[in-house]
């Protein structure tokens, strides 16, 4: 946001609110800032520089522009999911301004974002998931720091169902009981700074333990608390994790797209397939509402339906 008009100050106040009071991550703040800068440019072009002057018609027109391409302006139409994300930022801004007494009415309250098509999460079968993890390398006698780290990251990603940001944000002190015969636990910090404790099994504990003993000391040139380190001694990034997952999937010969979130989807789906209660899975995933977790039950029902259609004599 370039100018210092009323809208600029109000947007900055909202972003500060998200950071300080809501505990939004740096990634979320960056996305909201980009979306609101786009909204601010539209308002400025419309001659509006204060949220008190914004009408429902302004917000409606902005939503329409997001969905409409304009070659003269070099503007491409956004996908429904991108429009929904942008409008979430706009609606949040106006809701905040109303609650804070900046505006008397919420101009965006009645402007609903498009419903993106429901995409079911894609889980890997258990054997393929194990193949991807093993493709990261690292044998019992391996001394290569990168391979030991990559194997530990993938083992822990699948064992805990962590989000990518949660995994790369782990510190050494977030681990507990790696030497316990029944497995250990990890403290994950999710959205809004909420903490949860997730148990992890022996394969992950052993892989992380091997990394801590045989690899991390060689990488820890800067000191610091981060669990997973890059070659320069800094905390690994989400992009590094994405690359590790992508390379391991290719090595394992998996054709479908595999991302760190595929590990989370597989974690949840395999638990439910194994008979886990959905409320337990909700807690392990860190979902605030069980409704979010229920999408995984649709995946397992689809699997059951496919097996039934394939095997039942009266299915055809």
Region spans (language model):
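Conserved catalytic core of the tyrosine transesterase superfamily
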Residues: 1-316
């Amino acid at each position: 946001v370039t100018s210092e008009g009323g809208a600029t100050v109000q947007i900055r106040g909202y972003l500060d609110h998200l950071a300080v009071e809501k505990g939004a991550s740096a990634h979320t703040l960056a996305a909201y800032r980009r979306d609101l800068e786009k909204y601010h440019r539209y308002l400025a072009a419309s001659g509006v520089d204060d949220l008190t002057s914004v009408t429902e018609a302004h917000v409606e027109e902005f939503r329409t522009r997001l969905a409409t391409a304009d070659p003269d302006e070099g503007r491409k139409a956004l996908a429904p999911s991108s429009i929904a994300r942008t409008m979430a930022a706009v609606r949040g801004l106006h809701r905040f301004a109303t609650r804070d007494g900046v505006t008397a009415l919420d101009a965006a309250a009645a402007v609903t974002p498009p419903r993106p098509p429901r995409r079911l999460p894609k889980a890997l079968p258990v054997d393929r998931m194990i193949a991807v993890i093993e493709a990261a390398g690292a044998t019992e006698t391996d001394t290569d720091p990168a391979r030991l780290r990559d194997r530990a990251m993938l083992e822990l990603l699948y064992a805990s169902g962590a989000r990518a940001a949660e995994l790369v944000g782990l510190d050494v002190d977030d681990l507990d009981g790696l030497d316990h015969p029944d497995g250990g636990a990890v403290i994950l910090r999710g959205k809004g700074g909420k903490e949860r404790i997730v148990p992890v099994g022996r394969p992950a504990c052993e892989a992380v333990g091997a990394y801590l003993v045989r690899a991390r000391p060689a990488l820890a040139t800067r000191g610091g608390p981060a669990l997973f380190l890059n070659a320069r001694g800094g905390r690994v990034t989400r992009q590094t994790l994405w690359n590790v997952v992508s390379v391991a999937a290719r090595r394992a010969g998996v054709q479908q797209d595999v991302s760190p979130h595929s590990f989370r989807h597989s974690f949840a789906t395999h638990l439910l397939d194994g008979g886990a209660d959905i409320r337990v899975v909700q807690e392990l995933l860190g979902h605030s509402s069980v409704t979010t977790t229920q999408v995984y039950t649709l995946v397992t029902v689809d699997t059951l339906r496919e097996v039934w259609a394939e095997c039942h004599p009266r299915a055809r």
